[in-house]
């Protein structure tokens, strides 16, 4: 009997740490979208920072300057046609464009495609209707990517009417929440 008691106590001492670890991981919250910003958005420009101007050509070769959109909210969607996460987010960004574009919010896609035809095909395939610009340089070589501290795509910035960063994130749901806070009359 004493041996059985000793064995049970030893087993309890051995099993206790494993049970505690199992309970701790069961109590831990599942990975959240906030974790993505903590992982990929830590170096992005902070809210209140002046948004660097973007002067690039549109997909049809016309000049574009971000400063021309002063006085409006602007959503800058940094993406590329070869990026699976960008393609996954694209329909949601289009929904936001259709909803908030009607309120005067400008949407601008900043592509890191290197090839004009690939870029055009990506825009057509995804059905993107808002303004698209690019310097046709890879993200690591693009002055725009450097100015906006882009290290991961998709990355989305919201620029306020005064030309300041209002939001910088890799989570499209945060863009939706922010725009809904600015335009509460738009139903979720």
For each feature predicted by the language model, list its residue ranges.
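N-proximal helix/coil linker or "cap" segments that precede and/or mark the start of modular domains
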Residues: 22-53, 121-124
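Bacterial Sec-dependent N-terminal signal peptides
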Residues: 1-26, 186
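Structural microenvironment flanking redox-active thiols in thiol-disulfide oxidoreductases
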Residues: 88-126, 137-146
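Active-site acidic short loop of glycosyltransferases
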Residues: 70-72, 102, 128, 150
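Conserved redox-active cysteine motifs that mediate thiol-disulfide chemistry
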Residues: 71, 78-95
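A short beta-strand-turn-helix
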Residues: 54-74
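Thiol/disulfide oxidoreductase modules built on the thioredoxin-like
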Residues: 126-128, 135-184
